[in-house]
Amino acid sequence: TGLEKKKENKSAPLLFNLAELQNECSRLFKISPDETLRITQELYEKKLVTYPRTDARVLSTAVAKEIYKNINGLRGYEPAAGYAAEILSGGSYKTIAKTKYTNDKQITDHYAIIPTGQTGAVRGLSAIALKVYDTIVKRFLAIFYPPAVYQKVAIIMKKDTESLFSSFKVLISEGYLKVAGIPASQNRGNKNNDDETEDVKCDAAMLELLQKLKKGDIIQAGEFFVKEGKTSPPKRYNSGSLILAMENAGQLIEDEELRAQIKGSGIGTSATRAEILKKLIDKGYIRLNGKTQIITPTLLGEMIYDVVAASIKYLLDPTLTASWEKGLTGVADSSISSREYLDKLEGYVTRRTLAVKQVNNQYMLRPYFDYAASFYK
């Protein structure tokens, strides 16, 4: 009763900033953000990649104009030589400044992490450092390739009074996927948890059959069955995804004005987020599984959370950070003076500190501690 056919383009992702690289390396290689930063710093010192402590995921206009040098240099790195030559031959690098991968407004101090094109020190890299370097190279080269193209076919069928829906998707042109190291058969990022239906991957033969369908055709049904499932709780953070959550902490703020203030800053900076996690681990507040990189709270961590939540809950709300950022913005644009801002800040801290000193909630907290402890036996 219904038939829709359309093509869908999927462009290469933006370049790596430090948080994205830490997340990717945690996922692919099961290494901690601290280790990723250490390795990337080593690559930088060996002049293999650009400055690592950056929040930007794009190129500057000035760098885009000279990007030929970076690509041409990668012809000396055997795994990327063919791709680099293909890009130079096709000339796609000449227009990169006009794409979403170049944006001066999205850069504060440093542009995205990219290979420099100097490859002399590659031979001396450890196995894991070489993997990180290769990941950066592939992400960089991918932006010069066309989008991957998918063919989608959505079908609405009717049996008596019941309507049945099916959606099929097949890759017809791999585009950037061939350099990104993602197999054509792997359909990453195509699931949408908000959708009631999910695209079914199919091969070329199945696609050809679907392409011949016309509205009104009668389809022979082999069998009907009910597929049951359960909703799952959100996945636990790993070391990489927690870094991204810190970077984007403001997304949970409902107030649009305050959310805008914290956008682009979040918790910590690209240079300090890994160290913040390391400090929490060293103090015994959270635990890191070295093999899976999954992060879980400790009993001590949960108890501290309960104390803060009961005593000064505002410290757990990203809105507080956003309001402070708003004040700093006011100082920067001269809508308020630095003295006025500091007076308000000092007054707030003083009032909250005095309030906490007067709190006597030890007995109220005991049930929370006992409940948390029951999960750590």
Which ranges hold each PLM region?
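A conserved hydrophobic secondary-structure block that centers on an alpha-helix together
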Residues: L28-T36
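Basic, low-complexity terminal or inter-domain segments flanking catalytic cores
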Residues: E4, E8, P33-D34, P52-K377
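Metal- or metallocofactor-binding catalytic centers and their adjacent structured scaffolds
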Residues: T1-L14, Q22
